[in-house]
Design a protein with these regions (language model features):
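Short connector loops at helix/strand junctions that flank enzyme active sites
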Residues: 7-9, 24, 53, 69-71
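Short connector loops/turns at beta-strand edges and beta->alpha or beta->beta junctions
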Residues: 32-38, 79-83
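A short, polar/acidic, helix/strand-boundary loop motif
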Residues: 34-54
Length: 93
């Protein structure tokens, strides 16, 4: 389902994690229209990774899926302090 021009704003929830650090890791992204309508959900195993790598891969997956759906404005939601603060320019790498 493509995002209509009227709903070009989407909300993207992302999460990634590893069992062990590093260890077997997985990522997920859920894309919803601004009104809450589910547009897409994806999850995948990514092999061995650290928790931070998994969180970043989840962020990229969410952004890629939103772009593929035609979104022009994103609200990104995640639980990684590192990712949130880096994206908001509070942490420098």
């Amino acid at each position: 389902m493509k995002v209509s021009t009227a709903t070009a704003r989407v909300v993207v929830n992302v999460d990634g994690g590893a069992r062990g650090n590093p260890g077997p890791a997985a990522i997920a992204a859920v894309v919803r229209a601004a009104d809450g309508t589910l547009l897409e959900e994806r999850g995948e195993r990514i092999g061995e990774a650290t928790n931070n790598v998994a969180e970043y891969r989840a962020l990229l997956l969410g952004i890629e899926r939103a772009a593929a759906l035609g979104a022009s404005e994103l609200e990104l939601i995640g639980d990684s302090e590192l990712i949130v603060r880096q994206v908001n320019g509070e942490y420098k790498v």
